[in-house]
């Protein structure tokens, strides 16, 4: 089991002023959506640049649309590369989905789970990597319907990782959400993930619409079943770098730090267990 424990926080613009003064020691890295920061100037732009000069950053994109039938937006991808280069960011991930037809949309739509889609995505991953000169990391998304599926979501994700020879951003909350919405075994899904391809993890809260319908909102505290799944993930795959996502109903930083502390505690426990076993 690799010892690679880091805990991070998704940076939102309203946090800039506070973190410009100081960054709590519990936060090992930040994550941003480049689309929200690429054109930022003025005071916010200077504050952001000062942060990226002093702290580790990952990028998690919103609108690459890796699965779309439309051609890749080469100018957009070149802009992403320029942003990553400017801020010295090596880690760039995107959603295993599509969000565009004739233009960019921010609704992330699930891919059809088919061998044809696997081949389509794999080819586009190579195109993107050639431009950004970095690995393109893909994230398992939450989905609410799977029209035309010829394989399970698990089979689809594994096939894409293999065909594209790419890394995975494993979203633990999305596994839980999908397991409830589609009645599958979250533990079995987690165990099937290839450890060597997992680059880092996401964990977040969600909204329970009904007993059999959960919506992935990133707008609430993490619930106990997701915490347990995160612990199970560490036991199986090691205490991987883990990012706390909170996009809505953002509480005071102190409350977010409590969840980050919990991530760090679980990572430390996994390391202790591994050392005893070794």
Swiss-Prot record:
It comes from the Bacteria. Transmembrane segments: none annotated. Pfam families: MbnB_TglH_ChrH. Belongs to the UPF0276 family. This is UPF0276 protein Sama_1305. It comes from Shewanella amazonensis (strain ATCC BAA-1098 / SB2B). The lineage of its organism: Bacteria, Pseudomonadati, Pseudomonadota, Gammaproteobacteria, Alteromonadales.
